[in-house]
């Protein structure tokens, strides 16, 4: 039981979130701009049940496995000048290859050193390009999740074509690694309005394509629960490092600040810290050293659960009373991921 910050009546988490969400949806229409959901700003409960073992903060790393799945010309990289269309971008493709040759081995060794398991979102073509690396990621105990057939948008596809785009990556990953993905991440998180139904049809447990919360939540889809394990843009290295003056030390401090604030909040609310790593970006020597220091710092604190995203999703489902349940309307009305039917 928790206390709503706007009245003294004791309500469950689901009742509070549901009431505010229903009000937001009721006020929306297809003719109006997308509206953010109204929700509570404070939730209290018994912190012993937030995470396994009474942990007060969950920390989850993603490793984006994309090299080999990018277009041969026009993929984003570190060179500001765009190459002429159709001309192979040799240095940018080599930049992607760095992740496979150097970045992934270095990051996997770092995770082994600290006993941390992560979720690797894999592009099907990248797995075909470097199957041994994909298998090694899984062999070391990390999650193989799906990231599409190639490194490109899929939201503009028809429902059936988007489904095939996802299925192709799932089947490739399962065939090569022996692990069938239950988690999904789209290119820059953009999906069609039918994505939750499609993922549910394909047996997925969760997706990460929404940066709206600092904790997992459930969206009912056709009467069944589907989990969102939210994304964080500002903890994504591909977003952080292009800023002028940003370096490994600044990134380490940003990680610590994020951790410290969420760790403090974790005494009273379920909190989760998500960090997204790209092998070609965070896999460089100095950046791995900064991550090493951050992991040592985070592991020095009591009550921190380092978890794969499939573990977080399953725990959220198994502890539904502590997990926000958001009954959303159609994405065409709310502008947010939800059931399209």
Feature names for model-found ranges:
Residues 30-38:
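Boundary at the C-terminal end of the N-terminal hydrophobic targeting segment
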Residues 1-11, 19-24:
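N-terminal secretory signal peptides
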Residues 232-259:
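A conserved mid-domain beta-alpha-beta active-site/ligand-binding segment of alpha/beta enzyme cores
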Residues 238-242, 274-281:
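Short, local alpha-helical segments
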Residues 39-183, 188-227, 252-271, 275, ...:
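Catalytic alpha-helical scaffold of carbohydrate-active enzymes acting on polysaccharides/glycoconjugates
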